[in-house]
Regions:
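N-terminal cap/lid segment of alpha/beta-hydrolase-fold proteins
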Residues: 2-47
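Primarily recognizes the serine-hydrolase "nucleophile elbow" in alpha/beta-hydrolase
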Residues: 121-192
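Structural cue for short, hydrophobic secondary-structure segments
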Residues: 56-59, 87, 230
Length: 291
């Protein structure tokens, strides 16, 4: 007998991935590797002033088969709501036998983190040419699933351990973060085998998990002092809502209030599906921080 939850998830994924990729207005490199690029989408609608910048970090369990192209319809959707959009690519995991994974492993340590840090650091120089007339001071970072993790991490670089090469001396210039079904709490995610143990793979395998956790787990990098909202489907079977709830609890224990919007009858993929009502909720959450 087919599990109804699995059937629903498959239908939601099929809808989210049914949209053709949307070509960007321009693309710029932030490094020499082919994956070190950012696609830029100019706002398609006028807002009350210069358009805010939304940085998008795609999901896919940090694994190589899943790149930024699957989230371009979402980037275009945001542009049609009046946002300027920067869709970031970054290096992901391929096949590394020493990590004892079947198929592509999740992430590359430290390259995945190198790239996200480098991309965010490069934006102030790239945006004036790629998106003239927008307001980079009103910048919000969003990301889905594994990209939600990276969005939270990018906003927490100023609280990384002193030895971290990505540490910033001050908070990044962000209006806030909107993380969508994020892998936000690595211990909780691993306890539920989220994406086949992807969090441990991202850190280089079980042998490195504990040592690298303070450098990579958003739940260990609190408080950030940056406005943060998580949007989560209650019926998500890919990244269950308990992962987001564990992050919110960790933030509260650190003295920080984090917003959590739980959507009834919603799974993992409608959050980035322009045809889904949940996507409009995401846009509104971003707008509340950006404008």
């Amino acid at each position: 007998m087919t599990d109804p939850a699995v059937e629903r998830d498959a239908a939601e994924a099929a809808s989210a991935f049914s949209h053709p990729p949307v070509e960007p207005d321009t693309t710029a490199a932030y490094g020499e590797h082919p994956d070190q690029v950012i696609d830029f989408y100019a706002p398609r609608a006028a807002g009350p002033g210069p358009a805010p910048l939304v940085v998008v970090l795609h999901g896919g369990a940090w694994r190589a088969p899943y790149d930024r192209h699957h989230i371009t319809p979402f980037a275009d959707f945001l542009a049609r709501q009046g946002f300027a959009v920067a869709n970031v690519e970054y290096r992901r995991g391929s096949s590394f036998p020493h990590q004892q994974a079947e198929g592509p492993i999740a992430g590359r340590w430290p390259e995945t983190f190198d790239d996200v840090a480098a991309a965010l650091d490069a934006l102030p120089a790239l945006v004036p040419t790629a998106l003239p007339g927008i307001d980079p001071r009103r910048m919000v970072v969003t990301g889905h699933s594994a990209g939600g993790h990276l969005a939270l991490w990018a906003a927490a670089r100023h609280v990384l351990p002193a030895a971290a090469p990505w540490r910033l001396p001050a908070p990044p210039p962000l209006r806030g973060v909107v993380a969508l079904a994020p892998i936000a709490h690595f211990r909780e995610a691993e306890s539920r085998d989220v994406c086949g143990g992807a969090s441990a793979q991202l850190l280089g395998g079980p042998a490195h998990f504990e040592l690298r956790l303070p450098y990579a787990d958003p739940a260990a990098l609190l408080p950030t002092g940056i406005a943060t909202t998580l949007v989560q489907g209650r019926d998500d079977i890919v990244v269950p809502p308990e992962v987001a709830e564990a992050y919110v609890d960790a933030a509260a224990q650190a003295g920080e209030m984090v917003g959590l919007t739980l959507l009834d009858g919603v799974g993992h993929f409608p959050l980035i599906d322009p045809a889904a009502d949940a996507c409009a909720v995401v846009s509104e959450e971003i707008a509340q921080l950006a404008w």
